[in-house]
Amino acid sequence: MAPSQLPPIFNPTPQDIEMLLAAQCHLGSKNLQVHMEPYLWKTRPDGVNVINVGKTWEKILLAARIIAAIDNPADICVISARPYGQRAVLKFASHTGATAIAGRFTPGNFTNYITRSFKEPRLIVVTDPRTDAQAIKEASYVNIPVIALCDTDSPTDFVDVAIPTNNKGRHAIGLIWWLLAREVLRLRGTLANREVDWDVVVDLYFYRDPEAEENKEVAEEKVASAEDVGAGAIESGFAAESWDAQGAAAPAAFAAAGATSWEADGGDWAASSAPAPGGENWAEAQPAEGAKW
């Protein structure tokens, strides 16, 4: 990390640097755009360009000072066509009062006043200059300043302030938007001082897959708790109640079925055990004529 040119009050804390590294904000792509070269720290042997997180922090503070200088927060438009940044811009807008455009950017939002979604912002902040190219192009037509989260391969045409960071990972995007919102609130005075931690956790800015969350809820509903089936069932895989019910019902059913069959067949047994009438002996009986063994 290069020496900072900021006043000591604006220096990042060790926790801020650890969060930037943990979210992999410093890992760029293998391609390098010429205008992003000043923000490069080094290139790894595998070809991945590593971004200087000190420059990232300085640009976050610069962008926060620009945003805080605008009187009406609604005049700031935060945009993300990339899915990983849509939740982040919505949370940023709710915490700072900005206007969010999450998803597809309708062409003509800034230039065609006939459209219902026409806007005249004083500043726009985009997640990726490549996916949000339409918004940047229209902003250049009407002289709107642009702040963008730029990777090492991002185009910087018509971008006024580039925040060098990894803009492809969901954790990196969410963390940058969270840090930007926190610094804006500190400059506005919403947060008392820099020693006070923000009570909003960074996890709220991370992208979440709706299908994965729905499948997780369904799986949790199917799994029975220990209170429902008993602690022994969790270990053995069988509920004790089912064993007890089967053990109590089986002897009774067997006894009832056996008693009825024996009583019904009792008469037949007595008849078959009686001696044959006439004292006949099967050994004395003569075989019929024509019978052959």
Swiss-Prot record:
What InterPro entries does the database record attribute to this sequence? Answer: Ribosomal_uS2, Ribosomal_uS2_C, Ribosomal_uS2_CS, Ribosomal_uS2_euk, Ribosomal_uS2_euk/arc, Ribosomal_uS2_flav_dom_sf
Origin superkingdom? Eukaryota
Q: What is this protein called?
A: Small ribosomal subunit protein uS2
Region Disordered, annotated ranges: 265-293
Q: Which UniProt keywords apply?
A: Cytoplasm, Ribonucleoprotein, Ribosomal protein
Briefly, what is this protein's role?
Required for the assembly and/or stability of the 40S ribosomal subunit. Required for the processing of the 20S rRNA-precursor to mature 18S rRNA in a late step of the maturation of 40S ribosomal subunits.
Q: Which SUPFAM superfamilies match?
A: Ribosomal protein S2
